[in-house]
Amino acid sequence: MLNPGQTIAAIATAIVPQQGSIAIVRLSGSEAVAIAQRLFIAPGQQVWESHRILYGYVCNPRTGQRVDEALLLLMLAPRSYTKEDVVEFHCHGGMIAVQQVLQLCLEAGAVLAQPGEFTLRAFLHGRLDLTQAESVADLVGAKSPQAAQAALAGLQGKLIQPLQQLRRTCIDILAEIEARIDFEEDLPPLDLNQISSQIQHSLTEVNRILATADRGELLRTGLKVAIVGRPNVGKSSLLNAWSRSDRAIVTELPGTTRDVVESYLVVGGIPVQVLDTAGIRETSDQVEQIGVERSHKAAQAADLVLLVIDAQTGWTAEDQAIYTQVQERSLILVINKIDLVDQAFQPQACLPDPALTYLCTAAAQNQGIEDLESAILSKVQGGELEGANLDWAINQRQAAALTRAKLSLENVQETIANQLPLDFWTIDLREAIRALGEITGEEVTESVLDQIFSRFCIGK
C-alpha cells in the first residue's frame, strides 16, 4: 500500500475553472471521521451515523472561518468503497473552495492520496478483485457507450467468474496429481481420459476469453483513421459529412487544408479519431510543404488509411504515387464525387489492385457514409470481431497472462501424450495457476500493482 495505515485524502472530481456545480473531497482511513469532525460544523441535532448526509459548513479549525457550505457523506467500515471509514465533502464547484477543503484535511492529519490509491485499498481489503479494479479505470476512461458497458460488466464480476473456474480446475487437477506422487500405493491410478478432457475444456475456455482481447483493445484505445489523397478530391467534405459538422474548410482551391484536422467519432461502438490531412502533391509553397509532410506522418501513424480519389478524373499518376507510399498500410479506397459521373462509370477501373477494398461516396451530398462505416468495421474486425457476443473484454495485461496459462496447459497436454513422469505435469500446472492468479489478483507482485494503479486518476 502506498500510504499504509494512514488516512488519505484527494479531490475525487475533475477540477474545471468556473465549471461544475459540485466538487468532492474524499477521505479514507481510520482517522477520516475524526478529521471530518474537526473541520465540519453540522447545525442542529444532526447525527453522525453511517450512510447519512449531513448539512453544514467546512471551517478552518484554527481561525473558525467558514471555507464552504457543504454536504458531508459518512460511510463507516466495512460498508464503503475501500472497506475503511470513508468521508466525502460535497463542496461547491470551481477550483478555490475545494482546494481549500483539501488543504484543511491535509493539515488535520491526512496525506495526499496517490493515483488509484482508493481503488488499491478496495482491492487489498477484498472489496474488489483485480479485474474489477481495472474495470474501474476502464469505466472512467470509456470513450463510447459500448466501452462503458464492457467496463461495467467487468466491474460486476462477469470476467472474474470464468477465470476463477479455470484456476479451480487447474488446482483440482494438480491436487490429484500430487496426491498420486505422495501416496501412489494408497490411491487408484489417474483417469488420464478425464484429465485430458479437463485440460482440453480449459484450453477451449482460455481461447474463448482470449478472443475478446482485440475487441477490448479497440474499445479502450480506439482507432486512428487518416484521410489522405491529392488536393481537391473531397477529403475535407468527407470529414464534414462523416462528423456531421463543418470541422474542415471546404473550397474549390487546391491546398485549402494546410494542417491535420482532427475529429472524434464512434463507429460501431469503437472510438475513432479521424485525421483530415493536407492534399499530397509536389509544391514549392513552404507552408503547404509542411502540411504535406504532416500528411505523410499521419498516414504512417494511423491504424487505417482512407485514400480518397476523384471519380471524375479517375486514377491518376498522383494517386498512384500516394498509393505507393501507403499500400503497406491497412487501406480502403474511397472513390468520391460519384454523383458527378454518369451511370456508365465503372469504379473497378480506378483500382490499382483488384483485391483492394473500395467504396463510392458523394461526400458533398452526405452519401455513402454508412457504407464507409461498414467497410471500416469489416476491415478492423475481419467482418466480425471475435468475442463480440460477450459483453466484456480482457485488456493487454490480462491477455499476456492468459497466453502464458494457455502455453502451460498445452505443455501439460504434450507431457501427457509423451507419458512423462507426474513431476513434469505439476510444473506446467503450477505455472498456469500462477498466470491465472496474476489476472484475478490472487498471485500478483507489488510491481504489477504499481503498474496497474499508476494509470488511475488521483481520487479514484
From Swiss-Prot:
Cofactor list: K(+)
NCBIfam families: mnmE_trmE_thdF (TIGR00450), PRK05291.1-3 (NF003661), small_GTP (TIGR00231)
Domain of life: Bacteria
Function: Exhibits a very high intrinsic GTPase hydrolysis rate. Involved in the addition of a carboxymethylaminomethyl (cmnm) group at the wobble position (U34) of certain tRNAs, forming tRNA-cmnm(5)s(2)U34.
SUPFAM superfamilies: P-loop containing nucleoside triphosphate hydrolases, TrmE connector domain
Residues that bind GTP: 232-237, 251-257, 276-279
Enzyme Commission number: 3.6.-.-
UniProt-recorded name of the protein: tRNA modification GTPase MnmE
Cofactor remark: Binds 1 potassium ion per subunit.
Self-association and partners: Homodimer. Heterotetramer of two MnmE and two MnmG subunits.
Binding residues annotated for K(+), in chain numbering: N232, T251, L253, T256
Family from the record: Belongs to the TRAFAC class TrmE-Era-EngA-EngB-Septin-like GTPase superfamily. TrmE GTPase family.
Any one GO biological process: tRNA methylation
Residues at which Mg(2+) binds: S236, T257
Gene Ontology molecular functions: GTP binding; GTPase activity; metal ion binding
UniProtKB keywords: Cytoplasm, GTP-binding, Hydrolase, Magnesium, Metal-binding, Nucleotide-binding, Potassium, tRNA processing
